[in-house]
């Protein structure tokens, strides 16, 4: 490890300080949260060469993947909301991986139609609320509601952009994850890994991590409790976040 990485991170407001980078999110509708951290820490990066983050928000997941992946891996983040895209670009510029991450302020449908590259890893922390009740904040509405990007459209865009043997990874509320997997199956995707997540043992399942592929293969099913019964982080969750969270 270089001397730069041995220095203690400087704690700042308006965002979240990780061990190797800072994510400002004061201009983003969706803040740094457990869902994004889970996805960024969990996705399989070993064989990735080109990575796409759909709806990248503050750039959190792209930055986490950059930290975990090989130096030659290139990462594109696509974000529709202008303020979030600008903040993601700023976060990237201040990170150790500015040469590897590129933020595009663009609709993913246009990006999918016009972008020449295909990706062997695509990730997304997608919108999941139905648009029956609008948020007061238009940017937050875009970030949280499927009216801006339906799950059907997300799967279609991913199909256009993924390599033949690429992986598409998402995090969703558990019930919606079941529906997303069903919809994906109707569109020719195969579930290759499913992680059912609960806050602690005995509590209801509340999140799901999914890895999809266009290629059939064995499905791996796993379970994760974020905390132990007494409320402290579980060893499994600590292992996921140990390279990112301070004091772990």
Curated annotation (Swiss-Prot):
Subcellular location as annotated: Cytoplasm
The UniProt record lists the keyword tRNA processing: yes
CDD domains for the chain: AdoMet_MTases
InterPro entries: DNA_methylase_N6_adenine_CS (IPR002052), SAM-dependent_MTases_sf (IPR029063), Small_mtfrase_dom (IPR007848), tRNA_Adenine-N(6)_MTase (IPR050210), tRNA_adenine-N6_MeTrfase (IPR022882)
GO annotations of cellular component type: cytoplasm
GO function terms (MF aspect): nucleic acid binding; tRNA (adenine-N6)-methyltransferase activity
Gene3D superfamilies noted in UniProt: Vaccinia Virus protein VP39
Xref: SUPFAM superfamilies: S-adenosyl-L-methionine-dependent methyltransferases
EC top class, as a word: transferase
Primary localization: cytoplasm
Entry's EC annotation: 2.1.1.223
Catalytic activity reported: adenosine(37) in tRNA1(Val) + S-adenosyl-L-methionine = N(6)-methyladenosine(37) in tRNA1(Val) + S-adenosyl-L-homocysteine + H(+)
BP term (GO), one: methylation
Family: Belongs to the methyltransferase superfamily. tRNA (adenine-N(6)-)-methyltransferase family.
PANTHER family reported in the protein's UniProt record: TRNA1(VAL) (ADENINE(37)-N6)-METHYLTRANSFERASE (PTHR47739:SF1)
Function: Specifically methylates the adenine in position 37 of tRNA(1)(Val) (anticodon cmo5UAC).
NCBIfam families the record matches: tRm6a37MtseTrmN
Name of the protein in its database record: tRNA1(Val) (adenine(37)-N6)-methyltransferase
Species, as recorded: Yersinia pestis (strain Pestoides F)
Phylogenetic placement of the source organism: Bacteria, Pseudomonadati, Pseudomonadota, Gammaproteobacteria, Enterobacterales
